[in-house]
Amino acid sequence: VSDVQAGRVAAPKSSSGAAAARASDYFEVFYRSALKLIRLGVAYVDDLSAEEVREYRGTLTEPGRNSPYRDRSVDENLDLFQRMRAGEFADGSKTLRAKIDMTAGNINLRDPALYRVRKVHHQNTGDAWPIYPMYDFAHSLSDALEGITHSLCTLEFEDHRPLYDWCVDKVDLAHDPELWQPLVDAGLPTTPSKPRQIEFSRGNLNYTVMSKRKLITLVSENLVDGWDDPRMPTIAGVRRRGFTAAGIRLFWERVGVSKQNSTIDMSVLEGAVRENLDGEAPRRLAVIDPVKLVITNLDAAHHESLTFPNHPKDESFGRRSVPFSPELWIEREDFAEVPPKGFHRLKPEGEVRLRGVGIVKCDEVIKDANGEITELRCTLDLESRTGMPGADRKVKGTIHWVSARDAVPAVVRLYDRLFDVTDPDDDTDGKTYKDHINPHSRRVVHGYVEPAAAGAAREDRMQFERLGYFVADMHDHTPGAPVFNRVVTLRDSWAKQS
């Protein structure tokens, strides 16, 4: 339910109005429906073992054979089924089967089982039922009871649709209120429908696996951090990653629904989320690989508040105060001692514009005993500040910063694609999907954020300027100890690699 609510749709409700429906709520209705099928002469109790059933069923190229118990009378079948309900028979000794066509080309129609004897404790009904309905029978009737009009499922259920329709048509709940009277008696008003099953292709994405079995393995073997690991293709996972419901809906609008199995590029999903966040996420300043920059021609005690827009394209987001002081944190990659060709950020004796402040020139590079750069000493061109005559002076690069005096230390998790190959399901090279887990899919760094970012509520999304879109972690983030997950980069960083 929480996953569905995260998609900003209504919490699931049955036609009874219950917050969540369970098949076990309908066990009495299923039982009455089975009795009806027996009375109609289209269901019978079979004594064949599971192995014998497989033998009699036939193959894709050979028709099946009728069970020797197929022609039992209605009275005998009613008696046997009621005794099954009473718990007189051992597990697996009898089944209730639909009487359809043992020569049908669709094997699902070769007298499928509707009920079996299974004396197990049920989490909702306890030991009340020694028999349980089979999936196809329970699924179709549950849809009808819940007023479902269209039951959507993936292509592997296409061959099951004729059986789905058979169950719905033969039981005909909509015109037989006596069958669902137990729900009414329990105060659960019900308006059955005649549902239609529609199949579509599974939404496969590259760089991930969608198999439930493989996802369970990833969790059980601690290859990920649980079902809500932001790298997992689960609702809980993409929610914690920070993907928006609107972004996911935009993605599905773009790729559409089809019956053709295909694999969708992960960049399409990320692009839809990125597009949504571009218009919805306020901007904040953060530095995730910090090096200190000291402005030497300002008094060490200098401190002021600058006004920044929360969104460059939407004035309705308002403005905020950003503290500024002579000691700043900037990104380490925004300085190059020996700059490559085309580098337009800070370098020795070079100039760059500090976002919202003015132009600084790097005068001195301070290193530690290991040769690691620890500090950049710069002078600020005071004439280049906002409102001054030189404010429009042009330099090629602009970089962001965070005031060291006011910065809040933050943990930043940089998530990427879980696998390093486009099709981790492909095992033709002798490797399994577990061999292709991307070792760089989760990287944790420690940086600094401006106070407005630190004060975000859990699951608040924002753009860290020049870095990407981030979300305050739904479990670990607090204003005093902020934790952010990267949702997506500002651009498709995989495009150059593929």
Language model regions located:
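Generic alpha-helical structural element
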Residues: Y26, R70, G87, D127, ...
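Short hydrophobic "helix-edge" motifs at membrane interfaces and signal-peptide entry regions
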Residues: T125-D127, M232-I235, A456
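Long, charged, mostly alpha-helical binding arms that flank functional sites
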Residues: S193-A272
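Active-site cores that bind ATP or allylic diphosphates and position pyrophosphate for catalysis
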Residues: A6-R22, S33-L215, P282, V287-V291, ...
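Short, compositionally biased low-complexity segments
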Residues: V1, E52-G58, M134-S140, S220, ...
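Basic, alpha-helical terminal appendages of large translation-related enzymes
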Residues: V1, G7, K13-A21, D25-E28, ...
